[in-house]
Amino acid sequence: MTVKEIIIGFLLQIRSILMVFKNIFSKSETKMYPEEKLYLSPRYRGRVILTRNIDGGERCVACNLCAVVCPVDCISLQKSEKKNGRWYPKFFRINFSRCIFCGLCEEACPTAAIQLMPDFELSDFNRQNLVYEKEDLLISGPGKYPDYDFYRFSGVVIKDKKVDKLEGQLKPVNVKDLLP
């Protein structure tokens, strides 16, 4: 070993010690997770929920678009029909052990029934506990879009209501008037 190599090695050791002392007194970037929550942006894609209309009914019309667009096939549902002609899901099931939280189901939903909330604490030791049914997903409020009502904007007539007496709702669109 030459004197030059010894001096370079000594200076490298001094530089390493100075870097350690510099970082000892700087603020730590690590968050103490359970006690100190992380900031999540408003567009964070977390747990999937099902929302309700303004009147308290289910928004989901069982169109099956969410299940079709899901890349990992974690959504399953079965359509049923009410007496007034509206569709609703007889069962709605999401397997969160397969879900990749891509948000495609939220984008595909025409009724804004499916929404992603900023909940990310879904871990469990048993995989069967990560299969959520409709009762687990359905919340009591309208979620992110409180004023949105699918049937008001789509102009679909409900069997029990007369077209003349739609209170505060748009009349149904006559599709034949739209033809060229």
Swiss-Prot record:
The gene is nuoI. This is NADH-quinone oxidoreductase subunit I. It is a peripheral membrane protein. It comes from Buchnera aphidicola subsp. Schizaphis graminum (strain Sg). One of its GO terms (biological process) is aerobic respiration. GO terms for molecular function: 4 iron, 4 sulfur cluster binding; iron ion binding; NADH:ubiquinone reductase (non-electrogenic) activity; quinone binding. InterPro entries: 4Fe4S_Fe-S-bd, 4Fe4S_Fe_S_CS, NADH_quinone_OxRdtase_chainI. Belongs to the complex I 23 kDa subunit family. Binds 2 [4Fe-4S] clusters per subunit. Residues 50-80, 90-119 form the 4Fe-4S ferredoxin-type domain. Transmembrane segments: none annotated. NDH-1 is composed of 13 different subunits. Subunits NuoA, H, J, K, L, M, N constitute the membrane sector of the complex. Its main location: membrane. It is an enzyme of class 7 (translocase). Keywords: 4Fe-4S, Cell membrane, Iron, Iron-sulfur, Membrane, Metal-binding, NAD, Quinone, Repeat, Translocase, Ubiquinone.
